[in-house]
Amino acid sequence: LLVRSNHQRIAIKLKLLFVFIQFCPLLNISIVITVKDYSMKNILHIISSPRADQSYSKGLSSAIIDRLSQSNNIHKIVVRDLIKEVPPLADEVSIHEFYKHPGMYDERSNQLLSYANMIVEEVKEADVIVIGTPMYNFGISASLKTWLDQLIRAGITYTFDEQGNRIGQFKNKKVYLAIASGGRKTEGNPDYLAAYLKDVLKTYAGITNVKAYWVEGTVENGFKANYDQVLNDFTSDNES
């Protein structure tokens, strides 16, 4: 049988499937066909501020989630609160496991890397990731840094090609950064936060579609957050 195109192959497979289905009642066979709706989005919400509902970064990240929910078919929203469940600090034993090739993991490895493996799966399943963080001393929160240290791993979030170049494994994801700072950005103030997160996600995970939103001046007298104004140019991942 000569098949000249993919369309012909698909047509033949469908015909064979329909013939098989017709004979299923005679053979007392039942078939369940599951169709995945790829328009449904999974969202991962990372909260890293210790200020709970008083947090402006959490308020901004939640506003982003609301915008996404309005313009997308949401399948699932997973919330990873790094204050309620603090990521474990890397120690000598866990670092040794991090540097193992994934094919060398044993039962003890999986136990020691249980948190790391869990958050890797959360990121892997997410179509969109919303990360909320305050700016502390020009940088990200300690809990977010610890989460990143647990997440990033050779052989898991990135691999190497034959030339030794890193290849990120999570390229088709959209990330929104929701950043809150007590002061305001000026030309003289360095950005060690958004730039750092973008570089880490690009280099060690292959994620290049990263958009940062800032709520600034939160310590000023009479400050009131206007998240709609901050998000006035917001576009969801299926619109950008």
Per-range role (PLM):
Residues 44, 78-80, 176-178, 211-213:
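Hydrophobic/aromatic beta-strand patches that form the interior of the parallel beta-sheet core
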Residues 3, 11, 19, 32-37:
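Acidic, Ala/Val/Gly-enriched low-complexity intrinsically disordered segments
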Residues 36-133, 138-146, 229-240:
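N-terminal beta1-alpha1-beta2 submodule of the flavodoxin-like/Rossmannoid cofactor-binding fold
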Residues 49-51, 181-185, 217-220:
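A short, flexible beta-alpha/helix-coil linker loop
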Residues 108-195:
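Helix-loop-strand module that forms the ligand-binding subsite of alpha/beta enzymes
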Residues 187-240:
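Glycine-rich phosphate/pyrophosphate-binding loop and the adjoining helix
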